[in-house]
Amino acid sequence: MSVFVIKLLAIVSMLIDHLGCYLRYRLLISADVYSVMRSVGRFAFPVYAFLIVNGYRKTHDVKRYLTRLIAFAAISQVPYALFHNMYYTLPDEGLMIELGTRWFVCLIFVIVAGVAWFTAVRADWSVIWPVLALTLAVLRVEYRGVMILGEELNVFYTLALGLAVIAVLDAATREERDYVKLLMQAIALFGAGFLIMDNADYGLLGVALIVAIWIARDSVFSQAGILALWCVVKFLIYGNGMSRFIGGICCLIPVFLYNGKLGKPLKLGFYAIYPVHLAILGALVVYHKFV
């Protein structure tokens, strides 16, 4: 099973999950059908975590890979908030903009990034994406009862932080180490984690899974064991039912069937499906709830 096929399975799982949320919100499906669709969706994140580690091992440009994840974290945040309007009833007021309680951490990032950009020998425009993503993470924007930006953060924040952590850990284990650079990266990771971990989709549990899979990267059986243990821990913590546990544990199938081949490249399409489908579902939620 190639990376292409595994990605398609994860995407289909995610789409079924989110579609189930919308259809149940509209009372178009029964509670049993909703439970099945949500259970299918539990397959997606552990597979994404596996793909992040696999992508890190195969990429020739970690910075570009990380920047892409951060960029889509920023791009996806408004669609993600619109989609989650189905869970909120907000007062029908005018424009409201608030800063989260940890906005000062974001301000530090913006200042440091600005100084780094202006003092660089060659301007690096990729710094815009982490600044934008972290700024959106601390903003809450509502307009006439519609949440445009909320406190909950989309899964790209978790995936990006997980990738950044394993990149720093990998650099720290090499023979040639730049300790000053590693210290700065560690501080940046701590700040980003402090800023987003409480609100990001899957949060600390998701980042921990990515790191654990990377540590076990040389053994498919160890990776499978970690994924199984993660599903058990998640089941014990949240207790969402056996069907969702089974949906999650099915992630072991592509891990064992992975043949190491890339397959047909999806390029940016793999990432774009996430904000596009959330934007469509979010628009439908807003339309049916407020129009």
What does each model-found stretch correspond to?
Residues 1-291:
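Alpha-helical transmembrane segments and their immediate juxtamembrane cytosolic regions
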